[in-house]
A protein has these predicted regions:
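Negatively charged
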Residues: 1-192
Length: 192
């Protein structure tokens, strides 16, 4: 939790060697001014990214090329990171078990994460609650994830996020895997 609660911290640390770090939990939590390029960091050995950018209100850097294939914990990773809206759709999430609250209150986040392999995830409670996830991106997510072999009885909470074209996929996840999905319901009024 190196920079936790350092609200004014915003130094250039792009050249830091973090290739042996395994736990980044809470690293930038409450570092409300931090917004530096760390997209080149080698995070391939990290297993815990829980709360890494929680309450990092200014952070909005491209970390889409991070190798997160060993990460197990992503819970509350971007919680209340109100500026973050970067493409992280190509992340390898095959080992992740906890995505609870990952984008909760991340009020700018609206990206396509439908390529994520969430077959090991057991907790998605409040994952997209009060995020800015669009119906289109939610539809893509439901359509893709319904094709995976998922864990049973996962709680998946999205607040007011609505779906339109993926009603069948959503129902399949509920019927086949007993997922408990809480969202804003069916709404196709925003389609152009």
């Amino acid at each position: 939790r190196m920079f936790q609660d350092l609200s004014s911290f915003n130094q250039d640390i792009r050249d830091w060697v973090v290739s042996n770090v395994q736990n980044m939990s809470g690293m930038f939590q409450d570092a409300t001014s931090f917004n530096q390029d760390i997209g080149g960091w080698n995070v391939s050995k990290v297993t815990n990214m829980s709360k890494i950018f929680m309450d990092a209100k200014d952070f909005n850097q491209d970390i889409g090329n991070w190798i997160v294939s060993d990460v197990i914990q992503m819970d509350q990773m971007f919680k209340n990171a109100v500026s973050f809206n970067q493409d992280i759709g190509n992340w390898n999430t095959t080992k992740v078990t906890n995505m609870g609250g990952m984008f909760r209150d991340a009020t700018s986040f609206n990206q396509d994460v439908s390529k994520w392999d969430v077959s090991m995830v057991t907790n998605m409670q409040f994952m997209f609650d009060s995020s800015d996830l669009s119906s289109d991106n939610y539809d893509k997510l439901l359509t893709a994830w319904s094709q995976l072999t998922l864990k049973q009885a996962v709680v998946f909470t999205l607040g007011a996020v609505t779906y339109c074209n993926a009603a069948e996929a959503r129902e399949s996840m509920i019927t086949t895997y007993k997922w408990r999905i809480t969202d804003g319901g069916l709404d196709c009024s925003n389609l152009g």
